[in-house]
C-alpha cells in the first residue's frame, strides 16, 4: 500500500529488545495513520485497566501517510498512551522537524513498553535500536539534554525527543519536547517516558516513504503555496501567531482570568500580540514544510529578563499565566514559559494549578506564599511541583486529586482530570460541548470549535442544531490528526482537499462520505478505549464552577443546554443515550 512502510517497531526497555511486525493493507485502510493508527495499537496492546506508570502501559509514536511529504503542515508526529493525569485515552502532537527523522527510520509506528532499572536514551534508526546509558543526562533540563545529544549523535538532522526533570519525577502533566520548543504538551506523555526511565528518544535514517504520486504531491504543494501564501489566514498567523487570540477573546468576554471567575483582563495591552511585537522582537518561525509560520522566536528587550530568548509564548500560555494567574507583563509570561519548557511542564496545566493554588491559599487550605500577579511566587511553586516538595507533591498529581484532598472540588476546573484551554464555555457554548466530550479531557483542539463561534459562522449562544456543525468540525480535525496534517490549515484544506491528499499519498480514492466514515471509526476507537477504562456518561460534563457560577456580565451555560448539546452529539455519533457504543 502506498504512503506506508507497513511496519511497526516495538521496543521493550525491560529486556532491551525490539521486534518488527508487518501492518497489513486492510489494517491501514481501517485506521489510516496518526490518531487512527496510534489509537488502534493502544486498543490492541494495552491491558485493560493498566496503571499508566506500569511497564505494561505502551507509549506509541505514530506517523501518517502525509509524513515526510511536500504537503504543507505535514511535519508532525503523534504520541498515544493511557494518561497518568486522567487515567484515560491520551494523545498529543508536535511539529518542528522530528517527524521527518522518525519517518526516515522506516516505520509507521513505534511502540515503547517495559521499564528500565536505570536511565536510558534510545536511538532508533533504519539500522536498528540502540540502548544508551543516560545517567549523565538525568537531571538536565530539556534544552541541555537536546544540546548534548545533538553533539553525541553522528547522524545528520536527527529527531531528538526529550523530557525534563518533571518527566523524571513523574509529574503527571510533564511534556515531551523536540526541536527546542516544539512540544507534545498535554496529558503527561513526559511522565510516562519518565516512569520507564527514558530520558530521550533519538530517531534518524535514510528511508523514504513510498508515495502513490510523488510528482503529483510536489505539484500540489507548489499550487497551494502560490494560492495561499498571501491569504488572510496566512498573514494572521505569520504576523501575530496564536497570541492574536488574546484581544479577540478578551473583547468577547471569554478570556478566562482570575482562575475562571472573570472573562477579561483590564490591561490586555500588556500581554497581547502587540506587546510581544513592541517588547520582544518576534520573528516568524515555521515547522518544516509549513508556510503559516505561526511560531514566533522572541527576545526580551528590557527589564530583568532582558536577553531571554524562546519560541513563544503561545496563546494558551498567555491565557494560563496572564489570564488565570493575572500576570500583567508579557516579559514575565515569557519567563514562566521558559521555566516550564526547561523543567518539562505543560504550561496550560501549570497555569491552571498555580491559579488554583492561589485560590486555595486565599481560602486557608494551604500554607504557601503565592498570589495573583506574583511571577516569582508562581515560579517557586512550579519548582516545588517538579521536585514534589511540600504542596508541590500534591499538585504534581494534577487538579483532580489536589482538589479532592483540599476539599475544593466546587472551584476546581477540569474535565476528566484535564484542565481546559483559554475559551470560556459560558461565552462559547460550543466549547462547552468540546470540553465535555473530547476524548482526552477538556480540549479545544479536537474540534477547534472556537473558530466558527468567534468568526460568525454560528451564534455562540445557539444550542439547536449546533452539534451537527460540531461533528463536522470534529471529523475533519480527526482526519487531520490521522494524516497527520496541522489543523491550523483547516481553513485552507476543506473536505475535498483531504480526499486529494489521501489519493496523492496512498492512492486510495475517498469521497466525503468515506472520509466521514473513517473519522467516525477513529472517534469510536478512542471512545471504546475510554469506556473499557471506566469512562461513564457522567464524565462527559462540565465542572460545577462553570455550570453554577455566571461571569460578572451575567453570561452562563445552563445545565439543560449542555444536556441538549451532549445528547445531540451522542445521537449524531450513533451512540446510545448512555454514551456507550452501539456494538
For each feature predicted by the language model, list its residue ranges:
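Intrinsically disordered, low-complexity segments enriched in small residues
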Residues: 1-93, 97-583
Amino acid at each position: 500500500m502506498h504512503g506506508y512502510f507497513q511496519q511497526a517497531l516495538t521496543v521493550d526497555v525491560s529486556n532491551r529488545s525490539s521486534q518488527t511486525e508487518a501492518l497489513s493493507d486492510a489494517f491501514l485502510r481501517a485506521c489510516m495513520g496518526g490518531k487512527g493508527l496510534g489509537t488502534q495499537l493502544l486498543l490492541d496492546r494495552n491491558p485493560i485497566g493498566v496503571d499508566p506508570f506500569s511497564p505494561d502501559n505502551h507509549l506509541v509514536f505514530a506517523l501518517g501517510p502525509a509524513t515526510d511529504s511536500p504537503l504543507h503542515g505535514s511535519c508532525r508526529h503523534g504520541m498515544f498512551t493511557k494518561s497518568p493525569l486522567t487515567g484515560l485515552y491520551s494523545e498529543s502532537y508536535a511539529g518542528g522537524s522530528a517527524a521527518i527523522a522518525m519517518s526516515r527510520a522506516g516505520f509507521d509506528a513505534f511502540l515503547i513498553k517495559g521499564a528500565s532499572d536505570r536511565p536510558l536514551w534510545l536511538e532508533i534508526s533504519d539500522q536498528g535500536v540502540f540502548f544508551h546509558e543516560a545517567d549523565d543526562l538525568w537531571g538536565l533540563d530539556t534544552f541541555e539534554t537536546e544540546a548534548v545529544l545533538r553533539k553525541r549523535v553522528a547522524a545528520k538532522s536527527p529527531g531528538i525527543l526529550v523530557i525534563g526533570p518533571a518527566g523524571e519525577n513523574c509529574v503527571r502533566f510533564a511534556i515531551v519536547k523536540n526541536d527546542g520548543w516544539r512540544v507534545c504538551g498535554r496529558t503527561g506523555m513526559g511522565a510516562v517516558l519518565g516512569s520507564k526511565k527514558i530520558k530521550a528518544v533519538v530517531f534518524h535514517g535514510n528511508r523514504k516513504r513510498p508515495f502513490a504520486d510523488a510528482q503529483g504531491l510536489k505539484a500540489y504543494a507548489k499550487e497551494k503555496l502560490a494560492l495561499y501564501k498571501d491569504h488572510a489566514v496566512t498573514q494572521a498567523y505569520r504576523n501575530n501567531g496564536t497570541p492574536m487570540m488574546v484581544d479577540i477573546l478578551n473583547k468577547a468576554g471569554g478570556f478566562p482570568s482570575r482562575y475562571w471567575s472573570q472573562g477579561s483582563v483590564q490591561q490586555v495591552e500588556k500581554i497581547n500580540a502587540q506587546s510581544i511585537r513592541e517588547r520582544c522582537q518576534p520573528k516568524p518561525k515555521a515547522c518544516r514544510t509549513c508556510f503559516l509560520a505561526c511560531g514566533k522566536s522572541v527576545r526580551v528587550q528590557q527589564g530583568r529578563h532582558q536577553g531571554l530568548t524562546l519560541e513563544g509564548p503561545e496563546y494558551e500560555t498567555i491565557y494560563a499565566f496572564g489570564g488565570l494567574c493575572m500576570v500583567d507583563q508579557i516579559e514575565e509570561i515569557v519567563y514562566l514559559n521558559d521555566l516550564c519548557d526547561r523543567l518539562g511542564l505543560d504550561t496550560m496545566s501549570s497555569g491552571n494549578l498555580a491559579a488554583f493554588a492561589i485560590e486555595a491559599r486565599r481560602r486557608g487550605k494551604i500554607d504557601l506564599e503565592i498570589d495573583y500577579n506574583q511571577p516569582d511566587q508562581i515560579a517557586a511553586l512550579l519548582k516545588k511541583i517538579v521536585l514534589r516538595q511540600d504542596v508541590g507533591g500534591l499538585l504534581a498529581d494534577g487538579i483532580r486529586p489536589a482538589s479532592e484532598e483540599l476539599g475544593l472540588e466546587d472551584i476546581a476546573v477540569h474535565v476528566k482530570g484535564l484542565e481546559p484551554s483559554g475559551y470560556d464555555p459560558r461565552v462559547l457554548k460550543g466549547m462547552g460541548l468540546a470540553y465535555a466530550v473530547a476524548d482526552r479531557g477538556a480540549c479545544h483542539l479536537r474540534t477547534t470549535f472556537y473558530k466558527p463561534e468567534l468568526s460568525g459562522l454560528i451564534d455562540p449562544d445557539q444550542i439547536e442544531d449546533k452539534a451537527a456543525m460540531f461533528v463536522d468540525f470534529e471529523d475533519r480535525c480527526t482526519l487531520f490528526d490521522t494524516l497527520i496534517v496541522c489543523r491550523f490549515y483547516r481553513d485552507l484544506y476543506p473536505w475535498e482537499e483531504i480526499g486529494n491528499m489521501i489519493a496523492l499519498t496512498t492512492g486510495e480514492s475517498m469521497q466525503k462520505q468515506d472520509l466521514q466514515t473513517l473519522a467516525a471509526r477513529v472517534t469510536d476507537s478512542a471512545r471504546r478505549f475510554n469506556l473499557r477504562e471506566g469512562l461513564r456518561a457522567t464524565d462527559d460534563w462540565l465542572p460545577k464552577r462553570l455550570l453554577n457560577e455566571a461571569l460578572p456580565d451575567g453570561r452562563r451555560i445552563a445545565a439543560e443546554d449542555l444536556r441538549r448539546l451532549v445528547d445531540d452529539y451522542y445521537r449524531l455519533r450513533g451512540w446510545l443515550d448512555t454514551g456507550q457504543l452501539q456494538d
